[in-house]
Every structure is written in structure tokens, then in C-alpha cells.
């Protein structure tokens, strides 16, 4: 699959970001992860992002990273494209991008570099070097200390033919408006804010109709119901789900830092697809928070 083909795929549909399964010792659980992907695949996500933020990319060792990507590629071959997370320092991101391409992934999501702040010139060079190291498609993740301005994005689209996507987690509506209006269909645009469903309608209005759904990990039926309603401008359904489910979910998520990932793993366990614990420095939900989440999920019915 070339970069343009991947761009067309991620321009439509719901994007799945599966959690990464660990056993009770905190080691990667390959068989459980494989079963998870087999369970989620038939629900109709347009692409699957292995070892992304929700998949605890930041806590995987080099060998584990390779094993996660290889498992995803092997299980989903012929059914759904695999996009791998890759990031951190430039040379590490290049190594991971090359490894993902070698293992048969169809592209990467370029995660933020580590810790340090960087100039726009430095970010341009970082993205350019990663793009130049591979042939497949690269999606830039605009968040945290790794944010490009409009001028930098324009330069990179000219320098890097395989830069195909821009995932935004900044929430800066004016910036996204400028990007989509100026860059146009040269890139595909992905909404990437936590609990992205709440922001999906305004992002769609900006020309960014696609988003990453973390809740697809435990309520795939409802996640697809929401996406299809959004796509058809069924505001009665989207507003009902936001009010009755997503806003209460955010209240649970915001009780502790790191719950944006921990809550997703807890949800998977509640619906019978246990992915094991999160790794430090994240912490699992408290029992009270777990019970509140279980009660909220129960209101949706079977998935």
C-alpha cells in the first residue's frame, strides 16, 4: 500500500486505537492482544493504530514494540490497515518507522518527541528525517511540545511527499481552520483530542471528519453508532450519547491524571475483554471509579 492509498483510507471512517495487553506481571500478552484485534476487526474501523498512545507506546521496550506491530500485522492482514506509533527522539523514531515498515505496517503515526521543547526549524528537520527514512505514509501528531505552525506544515508538505496526515490534539480551532483552508486535501485531517467524540462535530465542520475513538476498545457498537450518526448529521443521536454517556465518562476520566488510558483498559475488562493492568507511571482505576464506569457502560446495553 503506497502513501496515497493510505491517505485515502484514513480520510473516511472511524479509527481504532487498541490498548496493548499485559499480563499480571506487566509483560506483553501476545495471545490476549491477538484475540482483542480479532474481536474488534469486524466492527468496521477503517484503520487500526497499533502501539499508539492508548496502546501505551511510551512504555514499550524495543523488542515489545516489534512484537506488538508484528502481531497486529499478522492478525489483521487483508482486513484492516495497520498504522504503527513511532516517536521520541529523531533517531529512535526513525528506527521504529523502519521497523514498522519492515514488519508490514502500512504507515506510522509520528508521536511527539520526548520532553524537550523545540523550535519550528527543529521540528521541521525532525519530521523530514523520519519521512525520508521510509516509503510508506506518515501522519504527524500535533500535540504537547510537538506542535507545528501553518508555515511549517506548508514547508513539510512540499518537502515530504509521504507526509499524508495531520492529527490534531491541540484543540486550537483557529489553527485548524487555517490549516484545513490553506493546505486543503494535500493532507488528511484527524481529530485527536481525548474522548474525541465530544469534539467530533466542530472538527467535522472544520473539514476534519475523521477521529480516533478510544472507547471503540470497549463499546465498539456504540462507537460506530455515534460515528454513523455524526456522518449523517443525526444530531439527535450524537447529542443524546454525548449527554448520557460521554460527558459522564469525561467526569470519571478527569478524576486522576492518566485515566485517559487507564479508563479504557478498565472498560475493556468490564465488557469481558481484559487487557491487564497499565504500566507505571500510569495507575489503574480505583475500585470506586471502576464501579462507576461499569454502571455507566451498563446503560448502553450489549455490545
Curated annotation (Swiss-Prot):
Functional pathway: Carbohydrate acid metabolism; D-glucarate degradation; 2,5-dioxopentanoate from D-glucarate: step 2/2
GO terms assigned for molecular function: 4-hydroxy-tetrahydrodipicolinate synthase activity; 5-dehydro-4-deoxyglucarate dehydratase activity
Taxonomic superkingdom: Bacteria
SUPFAM superfamilies reported for this sequence: Aldolase
Record keywords: Lyase
Coiled coil segments of this chain: none
Database matches in Pfam families: DHDPS
EC number: 4.2.1.41
UniProt cross-references to InterPro entries, sorted A to Z: Aldolase_TIM, DapA-like, Dehydro-deoxyglucarate_dehyd
Lyase among keywords: yes
Gene3D superfamilies to which the protein is assigned, alphabetical: Aldolase class I
CDD domains, alphabetized: KDGDH (cd00951)
Known catalytic reactions: 5-dehydro-4-deoxy-D-glucarate + H(+) = 2,5-dioxopentanoate + CO2 + H2O
Family per similarity comment: Belongs to the DapA family.
Protein name: Probable 5-dehydro-4-deoxyglucarate dehydratase
Amino acid at each position: 500500500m503506497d502513501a496515497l492509498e493510505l491517505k485515502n483510507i484514513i480520510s473516511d471512517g472511524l479509527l481504532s486505537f487498541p490498548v496493548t495487553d499485559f499480563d499480571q506481571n506487566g509483560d506483553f500478552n501476545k495471545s490476549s492482544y491477538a484475540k482483542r484485534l480479532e474481536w474488534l476487526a469486524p466492527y468496521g474501523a477503517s484503520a487500526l493504530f497499533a502501539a499508539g498512545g492508548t496502546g501505551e507506546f511510551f512504555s514499550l521496550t524495543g523488542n515489545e514494540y516489534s512484537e506488538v506491530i508484528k502481531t497486529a500485522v499478522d492478525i489483521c492482514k487483508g482486513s484492516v490497515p495497520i498504522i504503527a506509533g513511532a516517536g521520541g527522539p529523531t533517531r529512535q523514531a526513525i528506527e521504529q518507522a523502519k521497523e514498522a515498515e519492515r514488519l508490514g505496517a502500512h504507515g506510522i503515526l509520528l508521536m511527539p518527541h520526548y520532553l524537550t521543547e523545540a523550535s519550528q526549524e527543529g521540528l521541521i528537520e525532525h519530521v523530514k528525517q523520519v519521512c525520508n527514512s521510509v516509503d510508506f505514509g506518515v501522519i504527524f501528531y500535533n500535540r504537547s511540545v510537538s506542535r507545528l505552525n501553518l508555515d511549517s506544515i506548508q514547508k513539510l508538505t512540499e518537502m515530504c511527499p509521504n507526509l499524508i496526515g495531520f492529527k490534531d490534539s491541540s484543540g486550537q480551532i483557529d489553527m485548524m481552520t487555517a490549516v484545513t483552508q490553506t493546505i486543503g486535501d494535500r493532507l488528511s485531517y484527524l481529530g485527536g483530542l481525548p474522548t474525541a467524540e465530544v469534539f467530533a462535530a466542530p472538527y467535522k465542520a472544520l473539514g476534519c471528519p475523521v477521529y480516533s475513538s478510544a472507547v471503540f476498545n470497549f463499546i465498539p457498537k456504540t462507537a460506530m453508532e455515534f460515528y454513523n450518526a455524526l456522518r449523517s448529521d443525526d444530531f439527535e443521536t450524537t447529542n443524546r450519547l454525548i449527554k448520557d454517556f460521554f460527558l459522564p465518562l469525561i467526569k470519571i476520566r478527569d478524576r486522576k491524571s492518566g485515566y485517559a488510558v487507564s479508563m479504557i483498559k478498565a472498560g475493556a475488562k468490564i465488557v469481558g475483554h481484559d487487557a491487564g493492568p497499565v504500566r507505571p507511571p500510569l495507575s489503574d482505576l480505583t475500585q470506586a471509579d471502576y464501579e462507576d464506569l461499569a454502571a455507566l457502560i451498563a446503560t448502553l446495553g450489549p455490545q
